[in-house]
Each structure stands twice: as C-alpha cells, then as structure tokens.
Amino acid sequence: MKNKITFISAALLSITSTFFLNSCKKNDNSTVATESIEDNANAETHFDMIFDEVDDAAVSGGVYSRGKTAVITIDTLASPRTMTINYGDSNMSCADGNLRRGKIVVTWTGRYRAIGTIITVTPVNFFQNDFKIEGTKTIENKGRNSAGNLEWTIGVTNGKVTTPTGEIHTWSSNRTRTWVNGESTRFILLDDKYFITGTSTGTNR
C-alpha cells in the first residue's frame, strides 16, 4: 500500500547522536507511520551518502580518495561547472564499504563551497548497495545568518528509491541546515552540531 506522508522537522543534529521517532498515540496507523519514517530516513541517508562522494571528489579536485577506480571528469570551462563521477556498469566496492554503479552528475554555479554557490547533484542510472537512486538534490550556501552561523538550504525533488526487491519510495524535501557548533574545530568532527528545519513529503513502500 502506498501512503503519502508529510514531515515537518525541527531538530538538533549531532553526529554523536542517534534519533528515534515515536508516535504520541498508538493506533491502527502506527505501522504505516513507522514505515513512512523509515523510508524517509533511508532516502535521505542515500542522498547524504551520495553527497559525501561528491564533496570528496570536488574538494580534492578529482583526486578521488573514496573509490578505487571511479572515473572523474571535471569541466571547469562549462557554465555552470560540471563534474561526472562514473563508477561503471558493475558494482564498485568503495573505500567507505558501500557498493556503487552508474554515474553522479554534479554542477555548481560558482566557486565550490563559496557563499551563493548552488550545487546540483543528479544520479544517472545510479545504484548504491543495489538500491536505485533517482532525483535531484540542490544545496545553496546562504552564508552566515543573523546569529553568525553558517547556513545552507537543501532540497530534493523527484526523489525515488527502488529497493533490490522492486519496492518504491518517492519523496521531496526542503530543509535549512544551520551549523551551530564545531566550526572552529574543522578537523574534529565529533563536536559538529547542526540545527535542521524543513518539510518532507512522499509515498512509502
């Protein structure tokens, strides 16, 4: 059964924390709600993992450290700039322990990570651990907010995850991520904390 669900979130995210979402009331829809939350979290995680690959490749200038033999092509003359990460047609065992195949196409409108730059990430016939990932993720660097914290807007449109058994989950999301702790210790990740607000909507399995 497909069920549409909308999430409105406001959360403090720490990389040392684990989150559990619990319904306030137990009812006949509890199983559906649980599946929807799990599917949404799974979809967001897949795109976060994809962006980790993108970020590593872009920051290193194409000297790829996560994959073994992924072919990276960066066109700095194009407008916007374009990067393609090609894992090939067969599963590649990457350094982070995940299997990937297909391509990730990335564009960015200005200097990577600069204020105002918009990064767009699109998987093309892309599979991660045999889950097919579709859709487009857009990240805009908004600079510092009134409190002096770095802020980004992050959106996913036409997101779709197809499981190895053929189950499909679709979603779209719009979020704002604010870096509230850990900026001064760039190389110490354990103290990083982000405040995330926004909405997400989609259909579960």
Regions found by a protein language model. Give the residues of each.
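Short, Lys/Arg-rich N-terminal segment immediately upstream of the first membrane anchor
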Residues: 1-2, 25
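Bacterial N-terminal signal peptides that target proteins for export
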Residues: 2-9
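Residue-level detector of intrinsically disordered, flexible termini
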Residues: 9-10, 42
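Bacterial N-terminal signal peptides
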Residues: 10-18
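C-terminal motif of bacterial Sec signal peptides marking the signal peptidase cleavage site
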Residues: 19-23
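Low-complexity, intrinsically disordered segments exposed to solvent
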Residues: 25-205
